[in-house]
Amino acid sequence: MISLEQAKSLVQMLENGEQDQANMLVASLYEGTENPVLQEIGTLTRDLHDSLKQFNLDQRMTEIAKDEIPNARDRLHYVIEKTELAANKTMDAVDCCLPIADNLHDCLQQVRPQWNELMYGRIELSEFKALCHRIDKLLVQVEGDSTELRGQLTEILMAQDFQDLTGQIIRRVITLVNEVEGRLVEILTVFSGQKPAEQVQVLSEPADKKIKQSSEAEGPILHPELREDAVSSQDEVDDLLSSLGF
């Protein structure tokens, strides 16, 4: 607090036109006065500035943005291509198998009535001979169709080999996403000055409140070199904080 004598001296200096002496008196009074608000602001500014400098030196974020994310995009495109190729092969094989299975079913249905007559002993000799010839043809057909079915089923099985490779790729992409999430949490911590648990509450604020806060903000300084109340480089920030004793 300023004393009465100091106030009188300051008024007298101003009345006498002693501006330099008045400025020195005010400066001495200011230096001797503890300002907790200023101290707190300076401490927070220094912590934020150091955190930002450390964040700028984090080369991992640059690597992720430059290499990992494009690489992950290519991997996901590869997974899509392999999955689409396997699906097409599987559907083509099924399309080939269905007519074969239907044809076998129809042939068996044609033989079934005469076979039932044979089993009940009600078939004539001529019909029995005809049945034997039809069964012989059916066996030849079944042999060829079963070979075709086996080949198509093998094709379906081989088409599923993409799952092992694509599964590894997807797991790597998930790992990258988790790392990016962690880095974003660090960024939020730097800019909000809060613990991760407190950020959840910040992120869950109503949208209208966020819009109001953003509309009240001044925004970035576009031309700091034209303003006397702004700094334009990291060195000037360091000098400013050092001059304030932080």
From Swiss-Prot:
Q: Where is the composition biased (Basic and acidic residues)?
A: 206-215
From the UniProt entry, list the residue stretches annotated as the region Disordered: 204-246
Site note Enhances dephosphorylation of CheY-P, residues: 168
GO cellular component term of the entry, any = cytoplasm
Query: What single Pfam family name could you report for this chain, choosing any that match?
Result: CheZ
In Gene Ontology terms, what is one molecular function of this protein?
phosphoprotein phosphatase activity
Its assembly, as annotated, is:
Homodimer.
- The gene that this protein is the product of is cheZ
Give the source species: Vibrio parahaemolyticus serotype O3:K6 (strain RIMD 2210633)
- EC number(s) reported in the record: 3.1.3.-
Q: What is the protein's given name?
A: Protein phosphatase CheZ
